[in-house]
């Protein structure tokens, strides 16, 4: 029986709030960023309420005031809408890198916050509750040994956070109950924090992506392709967007018959069209051929129409993301793949990318070897045993084959896996990133994510498990993480071709889990509409686009007409240390890399200004020389100017 994919009860009415510092969401071993927006907790008596004149005469008031100051120093910087749910003093964080440290552990409705004043600067650990996968109790009341009684939180971003409580303090139970309640609000019929957080930015990120504008940018509609509203009420396919681009000569009634032959009704629809050859990338789900090898005349005619829309080629390639053995096995479940006998002039290619369960296990193995410490002596063999980079290679190689077929072969392609919302999204978005320089800009990449991932129904709620305590759910899988990893691999091979930097990619992944923004909530466009997310939550793009200097690559040069062909070879791929191993302070650069980005951007702007000034000077001299040369009363001796 299929699990419900509804995202009902995710939120209630929002409260006004302000943006957080991204630094506060990504630092496990350093003090909190000074730029963090925060407010003082209302639960702490304000020191301003004690008069200075009274303090001069009352030692007790003096002690109370100092105590309040210390309490404020130990509390987290709160976002509006955020409030403290529990606080435990004299808790020990078992840091795997720098050793045990004692301090105060605070749970709010948004974050887990630990601060120790024993070190200088103070030791701070700050993690959003959304990143927590599960919470486990360690030891019992009769446990012997130092730090043997406490809690361990297992996180979705590689970390494990372990805290020791004193049995006699009786704080563990309360902290555990509040973590289980607020880290998993969906399981407790509570709102995700995104519905409490509301901020107006200079730009509304929810308006960034407009499907009509994006299709017009691609030259759609044209004589071969039209935009249809057949799915306006999500009745054709509830996981597709309202507007679809389909062959112009296929009427809406036929689309419905095609939908009945495709898994989940996900018919082939256009993702991208080549501006010159008109070769296209279309995406869909598997055909429902079953073991009997059923056929659909409407589906065959539909793919023929896709092929005919491209006059440059009389062939079409069907890229099935799955290993062939998996595709064959799907026939027993009523699915399958296209027969080359039924689809004339079509060539079927299997890309051998494994399913969500294999990828989940691969990430689990990767986590074991990178956190908390790396075993140097067996590092390469351990990394190879996870198969993580092998999976990254296959995804990149598949996207590369698609891009090459469209660009060099001038041939249209159809891409699908089983349901068309996991591996298909990886392949189409990466191929489009290789083919179209627009998607390599910051805003263009945001549009790409909105279009190929969000509007076309990647099941973020199920794959990430926002606010859900069922950590062993078989639907969890790092599909989007793999996509971002592939993008990072491309930025390594083409360091000047992308407007965004590594910090941009890490920020997206951090907020994939944080539940601070509404961008990655729910499983489909229809569900986001029902939840009214654009009005009730803040878009991640609003936050990012309000401080673009943090996310801009100083080496970027516009290559809008260039097609990128990354090398999908194990020799050219590497583990993304900046993400997977970032919690280890020994693996961090001494200076945050995004600070260096800012310095380089400022330097580039300074040099560009000098170049412009020199160009104006040369232009002015050239104009003056021309005027003097054109005057009959003046004899001008040529002067060579060296700049």
Swiss-Prot record:
Its EC number is 3.1.3.95. A 1,2-diacyl-sn-glycero-3-phospho-(1D-myo-inositol-3-phosphate) binds at residues 330, 355-356, 418-423, 463. Residues 205-580 form the Myotubularin phosphatase domain. A 1,2-diacyl-sn-glycero-3-phospho-(1D-myo-inositol-3,5-bisphosphate) binds at residues 330, 355-356, 418-423, 459, 463. The modification Phosphoserine is found at residues 6, 9, 58. Belongs to the protein-tyrosine phosphatase family. Non-receptor class myotubularin subfamily. PANTHER family: MYOTUBULARIN-RELATED, MYOTUBULARIN-RELATED PROTEIN 2. This is Phosphatidylinositol-3,5-bisphosphate 3-phosphatase MTMR2. The gene is MTMR2.
């Amino acid at each position: 029986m299929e699990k419900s994919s509804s995202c009902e009860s995710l939120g209630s009415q929002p409260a006004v709030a302000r943006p957080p510092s991204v630094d506060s969401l990504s630092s496990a071993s350093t003090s909190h960023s000074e730029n963090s927006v925060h407010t003082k907790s209302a639960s702490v008596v304000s020191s301003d309420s004690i008069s200075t004149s009274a303090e001069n005469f009352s030692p007790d008031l003096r002690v109370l005031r100092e105590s309040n100051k210390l309490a404020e120093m130990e509390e987290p910087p709160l976002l509006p809408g955020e409030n403290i749910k529990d606080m435990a003093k004299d808790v020990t964080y078992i840091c795997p890198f720098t050793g045990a440290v004692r301090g105060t552990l605070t749970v709010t409705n948004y974050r887990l916050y630990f601060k120790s004043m024993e070190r200088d600067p103070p030791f701070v650990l700050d993690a959003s509750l959304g990143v927590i996968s599960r919470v486990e109790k360690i030891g019992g009341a009769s446990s012997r040994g130092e730090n043997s009684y406490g809690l361990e939180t297992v996180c979705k971003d590689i970390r494990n956070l372990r805290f020791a409580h004193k049995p006699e303090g009786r704080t563990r139970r309360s902290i555990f109950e509040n973590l289980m309640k607020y880290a998993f609000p969906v399981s407790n019929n509570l709102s995700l924090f995104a519905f409490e957080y509301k901020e107006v930015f200079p730009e509304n990120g929810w308006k960034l992506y407009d499907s009509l504008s994006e299709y017009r940018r691609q030259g759609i509609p044209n004589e071969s392709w039209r935009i249809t509203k057949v799915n306006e009420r999500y009745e054709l396919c509830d996981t597709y967007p309202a507007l679809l681009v389909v062959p112009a000569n296929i009427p809406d009634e036929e689309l419905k018959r095609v939908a009945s032959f495709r898994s989940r009704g996900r018919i082939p629809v256009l993702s991208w069209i080549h501006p010159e050859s008109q070769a296209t990338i279309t995406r869909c789900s598997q055909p429902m051929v079953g073991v009997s090898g059923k056929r659909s005349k409407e589906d065959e005619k539909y793919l023929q129409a896709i092929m005919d829309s491209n006059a440059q080629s009389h062939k079409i390639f069907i890229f099935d993301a799955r290993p062939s053995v998996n595709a064959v096995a799907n026939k027993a479940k009523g699915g399958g793949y296209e027969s080359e006998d039924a689809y004339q002039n079509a060539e079927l290619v299997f890309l051998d990318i494994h399913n969500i369960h294999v990828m989940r296990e691969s990430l689990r193995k990767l986590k074991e070897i990178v956190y908390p410490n790396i075993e140097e002596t067996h590092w390469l063999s351990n990394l190879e045993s996870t198969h993580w980079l092998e999976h990254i290679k296959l995804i990149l190689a598949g996207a590369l084959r698609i891009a090459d077929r469209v660009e060099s072969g001038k041939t249209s392609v159809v891409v699908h896996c089983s349901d068309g919302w996991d591996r298909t999204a990886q392949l189409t978005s990466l191929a489009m990133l290789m083919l179209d320089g627009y998607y390599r800009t910051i805003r263009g990449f945001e549009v790409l994510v909105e279009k190929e991932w969000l509007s076309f129904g990647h099941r973020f709620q199920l794959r990430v498990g926002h606010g859900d305590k069922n950590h062993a759910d078989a639907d969890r899988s790092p599909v989007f993480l793999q996509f971002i990893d592939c993008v990072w691999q491309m930025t390594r091979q083409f360091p000047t071709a992308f407007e965004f930097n590594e910090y941009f990619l890490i920020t997206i992944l951090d907020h994939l889990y944080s539940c601070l923004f509404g961008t990655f909530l729910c499983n489909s466009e229809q569900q986001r509409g029902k939840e009214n997310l654009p009005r009730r939550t803040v878009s991640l793009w609003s936050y990012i686009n309000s401080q673009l200097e943090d996310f801009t690559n100083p080496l970027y040069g516009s290559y809008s007409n260039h097609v990128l062909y990354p090398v999908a070879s194990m020799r050219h791929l590497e583990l993304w240390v900046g993400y997977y191993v970032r919690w280890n302070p020994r693996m961090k650069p001494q200076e945050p890399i995004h600070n260096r980005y800012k310095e380089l951007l400022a330097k580039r702007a300074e040099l560009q200004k000098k170049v412009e000034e020199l160009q104006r000077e040369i232009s002015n001299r050239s104009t003056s020389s021309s005027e003097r040369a054109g005057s009959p009363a003046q004899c001008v001796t040529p002067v060579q100017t060296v700049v």
